[in-house]
A protein has these predicted regions:
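Hydrophobic faces of well-ordered beta-strands that scaffold small-molecule active sites
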Residues: 5, 18-21, 51-53, 94-98, ...
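Acidic/aromatic-lined carbohydrate-recognition and catalytic surfaces
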Residues: 17, 55-112, 146, 187
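Active-site beta-loop-alpha junctions enriched in small/polar residues
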Residues: 23-26, 56, 99-101, 176-178
Length: 190
C-alpha cells in the first residue's frame, strides 16, 4: 500500500490517500461568498485524494471571523456550487467543513441581526481581527436557550443538506479547537 494508491472512504472513491486539511483563509467576498479566487484555489488542489474546505458557517450566528464563507444565502450556495463543479471537473473530491464559532466571535464580523451564542456567558480570552475596528476582544456570548440549541442543530442539518444538494461529496463538522461543539463539552466553557 502506498500514499498514491486509490482508496474508498465509505461511498467515496479517492484517487489517492492524500487529504488536504481545512485551512481558513479569510478570502470570502463582501457577502461571505466564495470568489473566483476560491474556485481557482480548490481546483488547483483537486489532485489530492480529498479536499476538506475551510470552515464554513451554517448560520449568521455561527460566523466568527472576518471574510469567512457561509452556506446561508443563495449567493453563497451558488458560489460553493461553482467550487464543487470545478473540483469535480478536475477529478477531485471535496467535503465541506461546517464550523460554528460560538463564543469565538466579534460582533463587527457578523451581520447586525446575528448574535454570539454559547453554552454559557463565559468570555473567551484573546482578541480577533475585524475589518472595521482592527483587533477587538471576543464578544461576551449570550447563553443559548433550548430554542437556540434546537435552531443551531437545524442550522447544521440544513447546511449539510445544502452542501450535499450542490455536489459536495460529504460534510465534516468542526467539533474541536474551542468552537461551539467543543464549548458544550468543556467545563471551562459550559
Amino acid at each position: 500500500m502506498t500514499l498514491f494508491e486509490p482508496i474508498r472512504l465509505g461511498d467515496i472513491h479517492l484517487n489517492n490517500r492524500i487529504v488536504m486539511a481545512p485551512m481558513t483563509r479569510s478570502r470570502a467576498g463582501q457577502n461571505d461568498e466564495p470568489t473566483q479566487l476560491t474556485v481557482d484555489y480548490y481546483a488547483q488542489r483537486a489532485s489530492a485524494g480529498l479536499i476538506i474546505t475551510e470552515g464554513v458557517y451554517p448560520s449568521y450566528d455561527g460566523k466568527g471571523y472576518v471574510r469567512t464563507p457561509g452556506i446561508v444565502s443563495a449567493e453563497q450556495i451558488a458560489a460553493w456550487e461553482k467550487v464543487c463543479h470545478k473540483v469535480h471537473e478536475n477529478d477531485g473530491k471535496i467535503v465541506m467543513q461546517i464550523m460554528h464559532c460560538g463564543r469565538i466571535a466579534a460582533a463587527a464580523n457578523k451581520p447586525d441581526s446575528a448574535r454570539t451564542l454559547a453554552p454559557s456567558t463565559i468570555h473567551a480570552a484573546g482578541k480577533m481581527y475585524t475589518d472595521t475596528d482592527g483587533m477587538v476582544e471576543h464578544d461576551v456570548p449570550l447563553e443559548m436557550t433550548l430554542e437556540d440549541i434546537e435552531q443551531t442543530i437545524n442550522d447544521y442539518a440544513t447546511a449539510a443538506q445544502k452542501a450535499i444538494n450542490i455536489g459536495f461529496d460529504g460534510v465534516e463538522l468542526h467539533a474541536t479547537s474551542g468552537y461551539l461543539p467543543a464549548q458544550f463539552l468543556s467545563t471551562g466553557t459550559n
